[in-house]
Amino acid sequence: MVVGASGGTGSALVRELLRRGRRVRAINRSGRLNAPPGVEVAAGDARDAERMREVCRGAGVVYNTVNVPFTQWRESFPAAVDGVLAGARAASATMVFADDTWMYGRVTGPMTEGLPYRPVSDKGVLRAWLAERVIAAHSSGQVATVIGRAPELYGPAVESLLGRNLFGPALTHGPALWVGELDQPLGPMFVEDFAHGLAELGEHEAALGRAWHLPTPEPITAQAFLDLLSAQVHRPVRVLRLGERSARTLGLVWPVAREGAEMLYQFSQPHTVDASAYTTTFGPGQVTPYAQGIAHTVDWYSTTARRSFLRIGR
């Protein structure tokens, strides 16, 4: 079962589970979803624990891919995590939690799962607290849980700093928005690869009770990523680059920029993950080359009208 099935990660995970031959129930707040044939769709707000207990009934694995706009994190995210935990616990199911790397803060070198949580942002503090809550539920015997982590995501329907602000303008001849530096090594993850890794974690008892970093391609600089995007759209992509000061200034009139400004450190220093624990235990995973992932993303944006600057959230 996938909770948060309307988002980029959730919709990719629905497709991945179908490819694996699994029966899939997709949950979003409206109960309306353009899902592939064979998918059961139901309405449910992750913050409503009683509803989560109802929709999780009969599930063996519950994938929590819920995310909300930055501006609603503090008020909505904890309740959403608790609600899905309650549903998984009632069903005696495993809960797989889709996570990021914001809890580590500023680091030097590739991030490993053994790093201490030293968040430098409010959202990183919340991510650390949520992760601890998810693992504590497992350690206390309430419900089996596992966490899959990705750095910044990109791909079809992904709402991130590498989402509509970048790909939408590239297709409409507008300036693409890039935050941070252009010459630092990054490890963006294609959303289909994230979905593959999450699905894999849900199938192995050996994965339970901890967080795993999922595999990405070799690091790439922002400029090289933009060059690949330019090649895909057959013209140089114009870029509006925002540093921390300009993002905070823009935040005076644009709440998304205000909320996102504290995360710019990720794009102003090397930001990569070490997934060797995962690959040693489960194999190489699915790792899509950047050129291929960018091509798939451009194809998706070329057939959707949702190209304006977005709210940001996975």
Show the residue positions of the predicted features.
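N-terminal Rossmann NAD(P)H-binding glycine-rich loop of SDR-like oxidoreductase domains
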Residues: 1-20
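Mid/C-terminal beta-alpha module of Rossmann-like enzyme folds, strongest
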Residues: 7, 195-260, 275, 280-281, ...
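Conserved Rossmann-fold NAD(P)-dependent oxidoreductase catalytic core, especially the SDR/UDP-sugar
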Residues: 23, 82-129, 146
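NAD(P)H-binding glycine-rich loop region in Rossmannoid oxidoreductase-like domains
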Residues: 30-91
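Short-chain dehydrogenase/reductase
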Residues: 74-78, 109, 120-132, 152, ...
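Conserved beta-loop-beta element that borders a ligand/cofactor-binding pocket
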Residues: 100, 132-157
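NAD(P)-dependent short-chain dehydrogenase/reductase
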Residues: 140, 151-185, 229
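Substrate-positioning beta->alpha
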Residues: 158-165, 179-202, 209-213
